[in-house]
Every structure is written in structure tokens, then in C-alpha cells.
Amino acid sequence: PHVVVDDFLNLELAQAIEKEFPGMDDERWYKYNNAIENKKALNNWEIFGPLTYNLMNYLNSPAFVSKVQVLLGDVILSPDFGLNGGGYHLHKSGGKLNVHLDYSIHPKMNLERRINIIIYLTEAWNEAWGGHISLWTHDEEKHQPKEMIEKVAPQFNRAVIFDTTCNSWHGLPETITCPDDQ
């Protein structure tokens, strides 16, 4: 299951959080560049600007977690203040993320991971550059992605909330073609 929420944040807040992102050349980014992915990520609370810090805190709060839990029924969710797999993510020109499964057991809490939330926060993004996340069904026999369920465009202030179980295939398989300065 998944849900796409446009205007996820107040517009002014989303614009202000976008301005808190570190620059593309900032040395604090953790760089991934391998056969599966080409991206940068940062999940250090000490580096977040104050608005991002408050947003991450809210997304891990009982108030927000209980709202998301409604989507899952009887599943009990726990917040992840360590932001394992979370935080800032940046895909520049040439970026990609092959269709994949995330790790399903949290490395520190030993709990099953259940939810991913992606919030697109690049207002000047042109949809023609790519960056669409694709969500796929699971092929039980071959243990691989089977059919694409949805391809979600990276629209500013759009959130994509989806399950991240051991069968939740997703990715950005098409190489991003934005200008180098975006």
C-alpha cells in the first residue's frame, strides 16, 4: 500500500526547509556511487537546520506516527530517531536508484521497518529531468519486481508514503538528467 499527498507541508515551510539543504558540493554528504545507486544522503541531526530538525522530530512524534498507523491497521509503528535510511537525500544529474528492496529489519532496534516517507523539496524541479519514484509488486516465485504499480512524479511538496516490507520494491531507475547546477 502507498499514498501520495500533495501539499504535504505548509508551502512557506516547505520552501524554507528547501533552503536549509546543504549545497551539492558540501563535504558532509555521504556519497553513494555504485551499480545500484548514485546519490548523496545525510542523516545527522546536528547538521539539520532548525526547521528541518523540527520536521524530523514531528515525523517521529507520537502524533504523526499515530496518523500513519491508521493506514496500516493493526501494525504497531515505532519512531526512528536514528533516521536509518532517512534524512536528506539528494540526486544530482546522473543520479539513480535501481528498483530494490530496503533492508526490512532495523539495524539498531531489531524491529521490522514498515514505512518510508519521501518528501520532494526542490521547487525548481522540471519533471522532464526525471526523479520519478516507481513502486512495484513482488514476484513470489522469482523474488524480484513484477509489475509497476505507480510512477510518482517528483512534484514540489509532494509526499509519497509507502510500506517498506521485505516485498516492497521501489526505486528511481531512470537516470536523472537535470542541469549540473540543480
Please name every model-derived segment:
Residues 7, 90, 154:
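Conserved strand-loop elements at the edges of beta-sheets that form or border functional pockets
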Residues 19, 58-113, 128:
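Non-heme Fe(II) oxygenase catalytic core, chiefly the N-lobe of the double-stranded beta-helix
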Residues 94-95, 102-113, 122-182:
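Catalytic core of Fe(II)/2-oxoglutarate
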